[in-house]
Amino acid sequence: MAEPVRVRLVLPRAPRAELLATRAVEEAGQRIAFPRDTLAEVKLAVVEACLNAMEYGVGEVEVEVVAHPNDAHPWIEVQVVDHGPGFDASGVPKPVLEDKLRSPRKRGWGLELIRRLMDEVEITSQPGLTRVRMIRRRGGQ
């Protein structure tokens, strides 16, 4: 079996820096023959995770993309790490469309999108470190 494809990035807190992470996902996914539409969903989840890390974290954002070329069931794992104050992911309310449409604050869809687009999502957070680990299998969802 082939070795995993691993890419590590440190993103600056700069406009459009999250797009560097999407390029890494694209390259890694192509190497394990992920379908284009599946890669688009993974990239959207990664953008959301990176934007959250940049908005709520402190300093640089660390991203690791690993494409596992398992012959029968290849999968992509992405971890996004920030060093902000941390948060309780279980305390983030699930957005309700009708409420968001009436609210002046339309944001707050990021975690819900990530959870819907990926097969597995694990969030660990404490003061100084938040890690969002996401997995998507080819043929998943």
Please identify what each model-predicted range represents.
Residues 8-20:
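STAS-typified acidic loop motif
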Residues 19, 23-47, 69, 103-106:
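Conserved short strand/loop->alpha-helix "switch" segment adjacent to the catalytic nucleotide/phosphoryl-transfer site
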Residues 1-8, 54-141:
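Conserved beta-strand-loop-beta-strand hairpin that lines the nucleotide-binding pocket
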Residues 45-46, 50, 54-56:
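Short, well-structured hydrophobic secondary-structure segments
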